[in-house]
Structures are given as structure tokens and as C-alpha cells.
Amino acid sequence: MEMELDDQGRMVVRPLLTDLYQATMGLGYWRAGRACEEAEFELFFRHCPFGGSFALTAGLQDCIRFLRAFRLRDADVQFLASVLPPDTDPAFFEHLRALDCSRVSVRALPEGSLAFPGVPLLQVSGPLLLVQLLETPLLCLVSYASLVATNAARLRLIAGPDKRLLEMGLRRAQGPDGGFTASIYSYLGGFDSSSNTLAGQLRGVPVAGTLAHSFITSFLGSEVPPDPMLAPASSEGPAVDLPASVNLWLKHVCIYLGLEEREPHLGERAAFVAYALAFPRAFQGLLDSYSVRRSGLPNFLAVALALGELGYRAVGVRLDSGDLLQQAKEIRGIFRTVGAEFQMPWLEFVPIAVSNNIDEKELARLAQKGSEVNVIGIGTNVVTCPKQPSMGCVYKLVSVGGQPRIKLTEESQKETLPGSKAAFRFLVSEGSLLLDLLQLAEEPPPKAGQELRVWLQGAQEPCTVKPAQVEPLLRLYLQQGQPYEPLPSLEESRAFAQQSLSRLRPAHKQLQNPAVYQVALSEKLRALVDSLSARGAL
């Protein structure tokens, strides 16, 4: 992994996780005597991912950790010396050795914010050479984190508020860094938990999981537990031989379900018993190792009823193949009738979890009204973001020495907005979002109830808006290398993301053909763009 530990034992990326041309440009700045000129870059995206109308910002905490720990080691400088021209002035490498972020300031959207095209996720200011070197690692830290958080938010919108979503994609992710990042930011985006224990240990993500088919198929049925006895949940009364009790319950279950007692797989039942002895208060069954109807379900019921007799309650079952929606419906019906038949009514409410390469289409089916599915495990389709594998974030220069800079290209979409800017969110009276406004930092902030002439991006004429509420978007998190505003916890950012999404209009939440959320420019910013464009950015 391209990580090292900071002074608090947390993982941070290393400075050389960057592109070579950052170092070659750095040498160019230094040779031109411009290394220490004050500059500002903005990190943003041009199009919302997945064909949607919004994105969620993520990765800010990782960026601040990276900046606070930034320092090139001797080995880093020696490597750069080996790939730069051999006649490079040694004083340049001494300059690199002395670099830190003590003159860097960062304004940013709070983590978990709604973000829209062109609005800066980060504004990074400091010495030109240094803030140029920061481009690639900051993009790396923000782009994928925001993409995964947005993907998770979309999946949460499809699932609705009541289904529990489990991220289980570590084994399918693009490497350990990708898996770790996905586990953190799918949680921020709205998932309930992750199977990734490292994300739980290092970042506090709630961890959850079931069991795999390998555990079940490893048992033949001839295994004898070293201690088959299980005490009641209340600790009152004698311990019971659990395997023997399960076998007795299996007779009743098979008669009730119309099965022969030899049909349920002996090894599967032994596996369930072993798991129940290890986790009597958290017993769950994976039902499809052999046959759900003829084996997994009756074996699970026998163990669950034996545990229930001792005062324990099974916590769930999982399905991993077949028609998940239909099977869940059938299983819920059996749980209901078996619970009533054997006076264990809690059985009706045992959660049913499903997994099996679930994508947006299948998730919508599993989340439909009347579905008996409670927990949905998603792996590949959350961590790999198959509908769009990259967020497309960019990091562009907007000012040097206090003078605005613009990039003019052959594609109007790729032109940049010059100058140091402020961003505001306009809301209507009921609290839903109206539009975002970008203006020059030197302009007075807009006020609620004030009529403003603004330019919607791409418009040929200005329009007038009158916001009921105005919220500033960018906050100062790092000032001259020192923390300014405390970073929220992951839990706080997750809650903020859900609150932010709740204020988005339904037309903007649509996952297919959504309404476009508008981002506008102030008249002064639009005039600056026109002026610099006409002059060719001279």
C-alpha cells in the first residue's frame, strides 16, 4: 500500500504518490525563480457521476492528514534526483528537502456535502511549486472517495431508508487501498456497515458479516463438538446437549414441512450447530450451500428452535443464489407458520439477508413494496463503481501572485473559471435547494431576500433570483499549515450527507434523466471570464 503512518498511527499517503511531471514542473518553477510565488488551485469536477444530478464530497479528512504529515524523506529526494536531469542544481533538491505545508491553506466543502459541477471541493493556496506538487495526491484522495460515496448514496436512495445495506466488496476492490477507501466512504454515503475489519479498527466503520459456504461445506456431519453442551441464555437451569436437541427438533420440522428426515444435509447441520455453539446469541444461517428448501431451511429451523428453547434468538439467514426476492417471500411465510406452530413468534421476524452481485436494477427489485428482504449485501457494484469508474476531478490553477489565471482550450467545457472565489447555496422558503452561486472572493456575500442578477452556466443572458436563504459553502480547514476548523467525525459526516440529500428536490434525486441542478456565476465573475477570454488570458 502507498501508505505510511502519521504521528498518531493513522495511515497517510506518501508525497511521492504523484506524477513525474509534478516534479519536472517544480524544477521549472524553481529554475524560473517562481517556486515561492503565492498561488491558488481549485479541485472540482465537470460532470456529475453516473448520469445523475449530484455528487457527495469525501476524502477531506485524508487530505488534511496528508498535508499535515507532508515531508519528503531523503530516500524520496534521492529518487527524484535519479530521474531528473543529472546536471540539476543540487540546491533544488535542498529546497525539496525543506518543503512542508506550513504555508498552505485549504478551504473546502465539508465532508458529506452535496457538490455540483464547477463548484470547488477544495481550494488550495500556498507556494506555487509546493501546491503544484500536491495536485496528484489530492486528486487521488478526493476523486475515488467522492465517487464511492456518491455511488453508495444512489444505492441508498434506491433501497429506501428501511433496508440495511452491508458493504462487502473488499475482495472485489481494486487493491487494498481501494478496498479500504470504499469501505469508509460507502458508509459515509449511506451504507449501514462493512465487512472490512480494518475500516472498523482504523476509522470506526461498523462491521458486520455472516458466514461463507466454505465453513458449511467443510463439515461432513461426522464431527463431534469437543463440548456440545449449551447453558440457557438466562444462565438458569442445566446445560443442554445442543446437537441432540437439534436432532429432536429436526424431526418436528421435517414432519411439518413434509420432508423426509434424511433430506437435510448432515454436514450442513453440523456446521450450523458448530456456529451456534460459538455464537448462541448471534446465530445465523447461510441457506443455499446445498438446497434452500430441502436442506438449508430445515437445518436452520432445527437449530433456531433448539436455541429458542434455551432462550436465544437467531439473528438472521442469508441467501446468495437464485431468485432472492421470491425465496425471501417463501422463507418469511415459513418462518411465520413455523413460529406459530411451535410457539416461538419471534421466528417470524428473523432478518433475511441477501447477496449475489446485486446491482441497481436488482436492488430496486429487492426494495420494492412487499419485499421480505431486510439486509442487502453489495460488493462489486459499490466498490468498483462499474457505471463510471472515475469521478473525473481536476485540479486547476486560478490565481498566481493575486492575479486571476484562466485556461482557454479548444473545448469550452474545459475552460476554467479564474480568480479566488467564494461559493454560496441558495434555498427556497421551504428549505429545498435552488442553485449554487460562484462569485469572486472580493465581492460582498449575497443576502437572503436580495434580488441578484446571475449567469447560469451556458446561458446567453443573465437571470434574476431571490433566495429565501443563503448558505456559504466553503470553510477554512487549514490555515498556514495549522488546523483552523475541526474536522467532523465520520459519523457526523455521514449524518450530514443524509441531511443534505433530504434537501435535494425529488427531480434532482432521480437516478435516470434527472433535472439538472443549476450553478450560476455572479455578474462580476462572468465579466472577468469574458474579459480574460477576449484578451487570450494575457
Swiss-Prot record:
Keywords: Cytoplasm, Ligase, Magnesium, Manganese, Metal-binding, Phosphoprotein, Pyridine nucleotide biosynthesis, Transferase. It catalyses: nicotinate + 5-phospho-alpha-D-ribose 1-diphosphate + ATP + H2O = nicotinate beta-D-ribonucleotide + ADP + phosphate + diphosphate. Coiled coil: none annotated. Nicotinate binds at residues 21, 210, 318. Pathway: Cofactor biosynthesis; NAD(+) biosynthesis; nicotinate D-ribonucleotide from nicotinate: step 1/1. One of its GO terms (biological process) is NAD biosynthetic process via the salvage pathway. Belongs to the NAPRTase family. This is Nicotinate phosphoribosyltransferase. It comes from Rattus norvegicus (Rat). The gene is Naprt.
